[in-house]
Amino acid sequence: VYDRAMPIAIDDKCEVFEAPDTDKIKTSYKHLEGLFEKSSEEHPVSEENLEKIAQLDRYVIDHFRLAFGNRIVKQLKEFVPAFIDCGGDEVAGIDYLIAHKILRKFEQLNLAYIKDEIDGLVNYLEKLFGTGKTPECKAYLLRLKKTI
C-alpha cells in the first residue's frame, strides 16, 4: 500500500564517487526482523519527542484539519530506532518521517487555503524541535509554498 511505503526522495545530486567493491551478504527475513526489534529496544523514541509529536498533531489538526493517525505514530516508533541504528539521530529521523509521510498529505488539501498557515507551521516546528533541527520539513513546506 502506497501510504505505508517509505519513498526515497532524491532532491539533490551528489558528486560522483567510486564505490569500493564489497562482499555480498545474505540475510534472512528473521535476522532482519531481529535487528529491527533490537533497534526498537535499544533506541526507543523518547517520551519527550512523543509528546512533541502529539503537540504537532494537535497543531496540524487545528490549522490544517489533518490528523496523523495511529498508523503513522506506530511507523514513527518503528522507523526512528532503525534510523538511529544506521547512524542518524532521533530528531533527524522524526524530521524525515514527518516530511515524507505527513506533510506530503498537504498536497491533497486546497493549497490556497493553507498558504497563509505554512510559515506558522515552520515556526512551530522550530519552536518545538529547535532551530534548524527540522530541515527536511522546512524545505518541503517552502517548496510547497512556492507552488501556490
Summary of predicted features, one role per range:
Residues 1-148:
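C-terminal regulatory/interaction module of P-loop NTP-utilizing enzymes
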